[in-house]
Amino acid sequence: MRKIRLYIAISLDGWIAKPDGDVAWLDQIPTPEGEDYGYAEFYAGIDTTLMGFNTYREVLGFGIPFPYPDKTNYVFTRQTDQADTEHVKFITADPATFLRELRIGPGADIWLIGGGQLNSALLQHDLIDEMWVFVMPIVLGHGIPLFAPPLPEKQLTLLHHQTYPSGVTLLKYEPRS
């Protein structure tokens, strides 16, 4: 079965973006030359991405070509008038139902890009198999949370942790059985 893997950056106080969805604060984090925080290896292990519509709009606002053209990309939305694009399939179905089917199909692992609402929906339905959470050395004060409330209590098992010279800390978890 394919794994759904959350790979995401958060501020020390738990925000994935500013209230307006802006993630430019990530550019303030020093990244030593040649350090990709495991991204290349992670990206090579997935063939599908998942994101909510607000996250998709933020990605389009980066002013670069769509960054995942070599993957199958699903964007979850409540807007039924969205037409699929060259790189994106819009999904209006219930995320949990859709992803239960997708996981049992052929393919590599699946990257849950976010945002907070989709992260929360998948967590509530036990559909996140791994969480790669990169804690950035910055306090934002307010913003969009990693998981939108309400949330059930979930116990996690720490699989790996790593602190980088930049102050970024990776916490890799899986749900406790």
Feature annotation, model-predicted:
Residues 1-177:
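Enzymes that bind and transform nitrogen-containing heteroaromatic metabolites
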